[in-house]
Amino acid sequence: MTKPLDGINVLDFTHVQAGPACTQMMGFLGANVIKIERRGSGDMTRGWLQDKPNVDSLYFTMFNCNKRSIELDMKTPEGKELLEQMIKKADVMVENFGPGALDRMGFTWEYIQELNPRVILASVKGYAEGHANEHLKVYENVAQCSGGAAATTGFWDGPPTVSGAALGDSNSGMHLMIGILAALEMRHKTGRGQKVAVAMQDAVLNLVRIKLRDQQRLERTGILAEYPQAQPNFAFDRDGNPLSFDNITSVPRGGNAGGGGQPGWMLKCKGWETDADSYVYFTIAANMWPQICDMIDKPEWKDDPAYNTFEGRVDKLMDIFSFIETKFADKDKFEVTEWAAQYGIPCGPVMSMKELAHDPSLQKVGTVVEVVDEIRGNHLTVGAPFKFSGFQPEITRAPLLGEHTDEVLKELGLDDAKIKELHAKQVV
């Protein structure tokens, strides 16, 4: 089967999550990904949050499928020479070292271009080059804070809240892959590689751009009418005082309010008293208002000017959601979802991780994949999120540390005697 990235050779210097998420996805698409790991220790996540002794952690395996691993001491002259040979054959190099680390190893961009003018050097950093904070190291939750996600997530009477989604790490890796694919396409036109960089702050901000939209609206109008703080006597501060936009100058935390212009809220369903995930998210789409009225048995609201326009009902949104919630008391979240679907109303259940892990539909479509792993035992991972009509990604287990060292060295043209010598010198 022809794969989208067949023939693309990727040198993967990444570790933890942002970079590995990028290179793993390239591996899913058929790229030849060689993970270059520090001799003797490898990617630190191999030992993080282990659920089984003496095997690589799920943290590592779930971000490093479809790769090969080589152990290499890049500080030795022989190690540096091997790396130079690999760069000459590479299409892409991906790294997420701290700022300036690659330069300190002796591999400046200028030197890399001398070795291979067609290679693309892709990097993930905390802040963009030229930013006042470009020297700072950034991890997942720091990125969520720096990019505006934490300040706008959570409830108004609580602290800034980080998301369970990896907005800083995996999201940055996906943005980086987009940049790499664009750079590969541009190389077809120019014949030369280039540097591609993604700042974690930028990647997070890209996903909260609607909050930048709201900041500009707030500065121009003084209010965000769809936010809970605009509802009469609904949102209160920690001292019990009602909140309003009279003294709010930055986009506030809106709880579970919808941010796309269509108001939404999290509503309880049957069983919520004992099941923390017995909720649905219900959206009041303007064009669906008549159907919503039919569903909740409020036909009189269809023609009532106090309800039948967004402007009319915006100051009553929370009261409306509370009323709708009463209709769900005798139905579980899946029954509510099907009920709403009969009217074409956007509504969905809150899916727990347990439910997702064992969802037969997700396994059928290849989103949740059982990885065959004869070393640590079979385990689940998330497959490619995109589906092709002419290509089905095959997910293979993550490599053991240095599992493919000799194989990769032979591809460079080294014979058995030379490989044995490099092992003896502890270069590989």
UniProtKB/Swiss-Prot annotation:
InterPro entries: CoA-transferase_III_domain (IPR050483), CoA-Trfase_fam_III (IPR003673), CoA-Trfase_III_dom3_sf (IPR044855), CoA-Trfase_III_dom_1_sf (IPR023606), Formyl_CoA_transfer (IPR017659)
Pfam families: CoA_transf_3
pH dependence: Optimum pH is between 6.5 and 7.5.
Chain sites annotated for binding CoA: 15-18, 38, 72-75, 96-98, 104, 137-140
GO MF annotations, alphabetized: formyl-CoA transferase activity
Enzyme class: transferase
Pathway(s) the chain acts in: Metabolic intermediate degradation; oxalate degradation; CO(2) and formate from oxalate: step 1/2
Residues that coordinate or bind substrate: 260-262
Active site: 169 (nucleophile)
Record localization: Cytoplasm
Effect of residue 169 to A: Loss of CoA-transferase activity
E.C. no: 2.8.3.16
Keywords noted in UniProt: Cytoplasm, Transferase
Domain of life assignment: Bacteria
Consequence when changing residue 48 to P: Little change in the affinity binding and catalytic efficiency. It exhibits substrate inhibition with oxalate. It does not display major structural changes
Record's catalysed reaction(s): formyl-CoA + oxalate = oxalyl-CoA + formate; formyl-CoA + succinate = succinyl-CoA + formate
Family to which this protein belongs: Belongs to the CoA-transferase III family. Frc subfamily.
NCBIfam families found in the cross-reference section: oxalate_frc, PRK05398.1
HAMAP family, per the entry: Formyl_CoA_transfer (MF_00742)
Protein purpose: Involved in the catabolism of oxalate and in the adapatation to low pH via the induction of the oxalate-dependent acid tolerance response (ATR). Essential enzyme for the bacterium survival, as it relies on oxalic acid as its sole source of energy. Catalyzes the transfer of the CoA moiety from formyl-CoA to oxalate. It can also use succinate as acceptor.
Assembly mode: Homodimer.
Name by which UniProt lists this protein: Formyl-CoA:oxalate CoA-transferase
Organism: Oxalobacter formigenes
